[in-house]
């Protein structure tokens, strides 16, 4: 009887080591999935409401976002759709929506890697790329919007409101998710 068949199979300690590495990778990918889902939710909250900027004077209260402008004069509030007349407004809208869509793809890629194509690295690369791309799109939108508001409202006392902050949080969360996925790739 030959004992060579014992050397074909990994030792029990190697099997446990491999299981531990797989567990670490799975936990990291679950963390990345949660972060990516949070980034999508934060970006939805950031894009939808008319609360990117708030202006509050003695006679007028006004707040607006990417799509709607609301004005309150003597307790009468009116809201109307904002026309994106200038190119920078169209660019901010486009970058915000692209960021949301690309982050949705990142969620899909992370789910694919975690549950369906566990040993396919290209799916992980796509998840990493889309997560970082979504963050970059949102960064461009936020930076352009803030620069233009600071220029156009230089003589007006205004504050950035919660939806603007949620877009920034979505961007940071997207970068964090991409970083966690990148780190999990080094563990594989």
Task: Explain the meaning of each model-derived region.
Residues 2-5, 22, 65:
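Coil-to-alpha-helix initiation sites in intrinsically disordered, low-complexity, charged segments
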Residues 2-16:
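Non-transmembrane, juxtamembrane loop and terminal tail segments
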Residues 15-53, 89-148, 164-188:
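Signature of small four-pass
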Residues 16, 45-93:
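A surface-exposed beta-alpha-beta supersecondary segment
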Residues 60, 120, 155-156:
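Juxtamembrane helix-loop transition sites at the ends of transmembrane segments
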Residues 75-80, 84-87, 146-164:
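Interfacial non-cytosolic loop connecting adjacent transmembrane helices
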């Amino acid at each position: 009887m030959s004992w060579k068949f014992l050397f074909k199979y990994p030792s029990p300690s190697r099997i446990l080591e491999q299981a531990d590495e797989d567990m670490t990778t799975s936990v990291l990918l679950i963390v990345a999935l949660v972060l990516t889902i949070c980034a999508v939710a934060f970006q939805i909250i950031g894009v939808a409401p008319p609360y990117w900027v708030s202006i509050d004077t003695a006679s007028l209260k006004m707040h607006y976002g990417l799509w709607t402008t609301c004005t309150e004069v003597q307790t009468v509030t009116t809201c109307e759709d904002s026309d994106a007349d200038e190119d920078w407004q169209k660019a901010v809208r486009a970058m915000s929506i692209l960021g949301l869509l690309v982050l949705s793809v990142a969620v899909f890629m992370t789910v694919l890697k975690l549950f369906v194509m566990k040993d396919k690295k290209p799916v992980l690369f796509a998840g990493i790329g889309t997560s970082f791309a979504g963050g970059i799109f949102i960064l461009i939108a936020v930076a352009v919007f803030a620069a233009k508001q600071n220029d156009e409202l230089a003589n007006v006392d205004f504050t950035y409101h919660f939806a603007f902050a949620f877009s920034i949080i979505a961007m940071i969360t997207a970068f964090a998710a991409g970083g966690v996925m990148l780190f999990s790739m080094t563990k594989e």
